[in-house]
Amino acid sequence: MNIAPNTYPQVMKGKKILYVHGFASSGASGTVKGLRMLLPATQIVAPDLPVRPAEAIELLLRVCEGEKPDLIIGSSMGGMYAEQLHGYPRILLNPAFQIADTLLSNNKMGRQEFYNPRQDGQRDFLVNKQLISEFREVSGQCFAQVDSKERSLVWGLFGDQDPLVHTHDLFASHYPQAVWFHGEHFMNDRVLLRAVLPVIRWIDNAQEHREPPIIYIALDDTLSDNKNGWRKWTGEELQAYEGRLHDLPGFFERLEPMASAVKAFYTLAEHYDVRVVSAYPPSNPQALAEKQRWVEQWLGVPAYGRLLFTNSKQLLYGDYLISAAQTAYLAADDDANFMGTWLHFGEDPYKTWDDVMEFFSRLGGQ
């Protein structure tokens, strides 16, 4: 794992994260190295886990008692273990709650080599029927202490292209914060930056009672390129919906982003509480679902739970609004009722997203 030069010394500053590694891995994994580079002011505790699951849980409970981590992150098998470390904020990455079945279905019986070096020098281990039985017993203890407090503490992140573990629905039946990200089973730089780090930042802000300034960004004509949406359709389809193109099924979902919009969104989300706001055409109720899918596809984890629908700008209470001056289904006189700073996207001096980012670069996160 080769993290870009981005580092975030203010995120989880002076705090402690316990990382619980996955099957056949160790505390020297690339994910651990990536976290340490991203969060240089944070102590990352990453013990090598015993192969026997009961021993692994016992070790983790001792580590929690001694280290008292501010956050626990568990990946795959480690996510299954981390779910059982109650009382701590936790992020479970592709958690292998059914690890016994996962090992069997992926031909993991027999001698297995560790992917990363371990402090004890052990290079391999044996997966036999006894170990499978032990995994089944320990994983069966997951979700045993789910209550309202636990539901607020635990996040689940699930790769939408994970070929190994498929536990999103199982997790979501117990915890509400189940989030898809674009990726596979194993972590890489992009997933750490765009999926894991945003959740770490939310948890850190909540712990510090930190409330960043709020930016509302309009979806239509600001993030998504509505004006050129017709280019995705045939002449016959366009003719059938002439004068009401926004009612065309799939219109909003197939829109392209504005140039540099996605990059700008991720950058702003590092410093602000960014919300996506969208109007909806009353004649096309399915547009809400289409816009939700667009946000999930293009903006991902940082936009989770941050999509708002309204046809009246005066209902928005925040610090900044980035929106085209004229957006379908939003009355022009609503604009004057926004109490914060309104950046008229598409007009001087904010004709492009590069212009918008120049404005915010001068503010330093204020």
Regions found by a protein language model. Give the residues of each.
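The alpha/beta-hydrolase serine catalytic core
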Residues: 89-204
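Short histidine/acidic/glycine/proline-rich micro-motifs that form metal-
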Residues: 22-26, 50-51, 186, 251, ...
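Active-site catalytic motif of lipid deacylating hydrolases and related acyltransferases
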Residues: 11-66
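Charged phosphate-binding loop/patch that engages nucleotide di/tri-phosphates or the phosphate backbone
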Residues: 178-214, 334-366
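Active-site neighborhood of HAD-like aspartate-dependent phosphohydrolases
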Residues: 209-253, 351
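Gly/Ala-rich beta-loop-alpha elbow adjacent to hydrolase catalytic centers
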Residues: 73-83
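Short, acidic loop-to-helix structural element flanking the phosphoryl-transfer center
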Residues: 242-274, 286
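C-terminal cap/substrate-recognition subdomain and adjoining C-terminal extension
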Residues: 270, 284-366
